[in-house]
């Protein structure tokens, strides 16, 4: 609790008919957004939907090649059909730049890091939220149960165990490899807030 206890927060308010209700589920980050995690989540959520209440479910694949493979094998379609939002490969949930939980919200997430602002971005103004780290499968099971906290072990799921196939074309088509082909004559474009290195004296032989 922030502000020396001045903010009143309790998970008791999240209990509905004896079950704990979650406001937000996230599968994200370079670890949480792995191919196997998201495929398993899609297997769990397939044919179900997350409901139209306050609960939200977002999935961030760990990389663009992983994202493309999930599109090819149908996992993205299953997730989107359920009501999940599948976003681009982005570190936002880890450092508070994406899907920051709302005030008094309870968020469950399989993500990699725990930076400031991840649990609410305005603590100094009295905002507070609760975040629990959880495995991707149980987050998907909770989403399939419309936001009521549910372990994946409670569901009978046939996991497809799909294999990942890396496709390098994404990087080959978009990322410039300058190794061995550098061209000093190409002018580097600078924005108004970026300046060149200041002129520096070379280091002497002995400091």
Where are the regions a protein language model picked out?
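Fe-S-dependent hydro-lyases/dehydratases of central metabolism
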Residues: 1-207
């Amino acid at each position: 609790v922030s502000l020396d206890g001045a903010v009143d927060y309790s998970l008791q308010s999240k209990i509905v008919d004896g079950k704990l209700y979650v406001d937000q589920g996230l599968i994200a980050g370079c670890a949480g957004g792995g191919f196997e995690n998201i495929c398993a989540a899609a297997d769990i959520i397939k044919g179900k939907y997350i409901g139209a209440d306050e609960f939200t479910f977002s999935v961030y694949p760990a990389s663009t090649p992983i994202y493309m493979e999930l599109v090819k094998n149908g996992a993205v379609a299953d997730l989107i059909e359920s009501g999940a939002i599948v976003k681009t490969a982005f570190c936002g949930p880890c450092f508070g730049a994406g899907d920051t939980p709302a005030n008094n919200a309870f968020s469950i997430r399989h993500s990699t890091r725990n930076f400031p602002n991840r649990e609410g971005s305005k603590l100094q103004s009295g905002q507070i939220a609760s975040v629990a780290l959880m495995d991707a499968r149980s987050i998907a099971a909770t989403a399939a149960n419309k936001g009521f906290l549910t372990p994946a072990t409670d569901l009978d799921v046939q996991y497809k165990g799909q294999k990942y196939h890396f496709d390098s074309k994404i990087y080959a088509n978009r990322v410039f490899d300058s190794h061995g082909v550098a061209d000093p004559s190409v002018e580097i474009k600078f924005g108004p807030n970026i300046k060149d290195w200041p002129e520096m004296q070379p280091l002497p032989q002995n400091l």
